[in-house]
Amino acid sequence: MKVGIIGAMEEEVTLLRDRIENRQTLARAGCEIYTGQLNGIDVALLKSGIGKVAAAMGTTLLLEHCQPDLVINTGSAGGLDSSLKVGDIVVSNEVRYHDADVTAFGYEPGQMAGCPAAFVADEDLIALAENCIQQLKLNAVRGLICSGDAFINGAEPLTRIRAAFPTVAAVEMEAAAIGHVCYLFNTPFVVVRAISDVADQASHLSFEEFLVVAAKQSTLMIKAMLTTLAQRG
């Protein structure tokens, strides 16, 4: 088994990359892919860059060059669920774009033309993540994660997103693009992110302060998931 792991930023991948054994690096089109073994599993760790285009391009390179059996998107997210606080975990049941709008042609908010309204995470991977959450005794929510090419900071975008997606648990900038590409490649995926900020008017300040906390928590989750997969054989 080979596991693809995707993080957007240096802070989101460095703790994992430093632990990869027999590490090799592929640099292509602004992305870096690190291959080797981590916690007993063959891995391909992608640092994609920030935003939907970077995430889609990097995920495509990862799937084409490394052909992982599954993909886990790690990193940080802004919490919209009222129960979430910094360091808590959000696990995707589905991902959607919050900044796509072709509703004039009969599509749902966030739905791209010719595509599903949502990209649904793999149930077995969700169960794996939630099992690890229980083992680690972390606070977590399973729910909708919405993505767009904007850092959500202020009342107006929050109001718009919550109105269009009432069940949204968290927002960030890559997950829906990753889910979109995995859907096209028929590759199972799940998003497991740690909350770095609560999406309010001061979210940019808390993001800068707590990104390291979120990176440590999401890394803890990835390592636990890999260990469980290795034990299953």
Swiss-Prot record:
This is 5'-methylthioadenosine/S-adenosylhomocysteine nucleosidase. Catalyzes the irreversible cleavage of the glycosidic bond in both 5'-methylthioadenosine (MTA) and S-adenosylhomocysteine (SAH/AdoHcy) to adenine and the corresponding thioribose, 5'-methylthioribose and S-ribosylhomocysteine, respectively. Also cleaves 5'-deoxyadenosine, a toxic by-product of radical S-adenosylmethionine (SAM) enzymes, into 5-deoxyribose and adenine. Thus, is required for in vivo function of the radical SAM enzymes biotin synthase and lipoic acid synthase, that are inhibited by 5'-deoxyadenosine accumulation. It catalyses: S-adenosyl-L-homocysteine + H2O = S-(5-deoxy-D-ribos-5-yl)-L-homocysteine + adenine; S-methyl-5'-thioadenosine + H2O = 5-(methylsulfanyl)-D-ribose + adenine; 5'-deoxyadenosine + H2O = 5-deoxy-D-ribose + adenine. Disulfide bonds: none annotated. Keywords: Amino-acid biosynthesis, Hydrolase, Methionine biosynthesis. GO terms for cellular component: cytosol. It comes from the Bacteria.
